[in-house]
Amino acid sequence: MKPENKIPVLTRLSDEMTAVVNFQQPGLPPWPADGDIETQRQYYLLERRFWNADAPSMTTRTCAVSTPYGDVTTRLYSPQPTSQATLYYLHGGGFILGNLDTHDRIMRLLARYTGCTVIGIDYSLSPQARYPQAIEETVAVCSYFSQHADEYSLNVEEIGFAGDSAGAMLALASALWLRDKHIRCGNVIAILLWYGLYGLQDSVSRRLFGGAWDGLTREDLDMYEKAYLRNDEDRESPWYCLFNNDLTRDVPPCFIASAEFDPLIDDSRLLHQTLQAHQQPCEYKMYPGTLHAFLHYSRMMTIADDALQDGARFFMARMKTPR
């Protein structure tokens, strides 16, 4: 797609989204476009500090979980002494960026709104770790906590997965992995998915949207994919291209959220339409005027907070004893 033919999304954003795009953090240097991956990771962490400030206070605990690939750090957010369910969170960042600190506010808000313990999983990043390592680490973490629930005051009879962007793919892929490999870590009552990618290689939205403002040009998306996958054959794997998995049966209820001007929105639309066509429980919600990654900006965007609360309500409604 010739760049001039793309939709000029910056002229169509909501006032809140425009304010975020135009916001300049004092003293923040420009994005190190030519820097190595570690430099970009450090910049991402620095840039996210502002957006993670003023988050709800609650009890947190860090735990290193042994996996076949080594220890994986997890962080438990406990808004109250006992929890009716456990929600595992996978952060976004194109498989190559992000950690528990870059998504701290999101997880704290989810814990507050659900009243449940949220466990953030600091899975290994690409390209140092490649598919399916992050999924297998997630499964190992779930297995660990299902076996040690009493030590952490967890209720793992009912669990859920949640994630944004690449983390949304990992959340759904991990739930399908548990189903397909017959691994039981608890009853998966819901999966909360914010603007994920689920396996499309091309789409109308990928042609019309994406630019320097969101880091999701076609070249960017290709780079993330090449960093994550081991080889070209992995593109068709049913835990990467999730549309190659069986979505006609036993898919946990999915809350599918999208951003209006996201090049990945067609992934969410197709996922919703596929699940709906096969009577799999799901709910789709598009948030108007937003760009990819808007969930981070709840300090300035009420719609970001709305999106978190919508996901929390979806999760709570599927508990045996809703709050």
Swiss-Prot record:
Molecular functions (GO terms): carboxylic ester hydrolase activity
Span of the annotated motif Involved in the stabilization of the negatively charged intermediate by the formation of the oxyanion hole: 91-93
Cellular-component GO terms for this entry: cytoplasm
Source domain of life: Bacteria
InterPro entries cross-referenced by the UniProt entry: AB_hydrolase_3 (IPR013094), AB_hydrolase_fold (IPR029058), Acetyl_esterase (IPR023508), GDXG_lipolytic_enzyme (IPR050300), Lipase_GDXG_put_SER_AS (IPR033140)
Keyword Magnesium recorded: no
Active-site residues per Swiss-Prot or TrEMBL entry: S165, D262, H292
EC number: 3.1.1.-
Pfam families: Abhydrolase_3
Keyword terms, alphabetized: Cytoplasm, Hydrolase, Serine esterase
UniProt enzyme class: hydrolase
Record has Phosphoprotein as a keyword: no
Entries under SUPFAM superfamilies matching the protein: alpha/beta-Hydrolases (SSF53474)
Compartments in which it is found: Cytoplasm
NCBIfam families per the UniProt record, alphabetical: PRK10162.1
Quaternary organization: Homodimer. Interacts with MalT and MelA.
Protein's job: Displays esterase activity towards short chain fatty esters (acyl chain length of up to 8 carbons). Able to hydrolyze triacetylglycerol (triacetin) and tributyrylglycerol (tributyrin), but not trioleylglycerol (triolein) or cholesterol oleate. Negatively regulates MalT activity by antagonizing maltotriose binding. Inhibits MelA galactosidase activity.
Record-stated family: Belongs to the 'GDXG' lipolytic enzyme family.
Protein name, per record: Acetyl esterase
Native species: Salmonella typhi
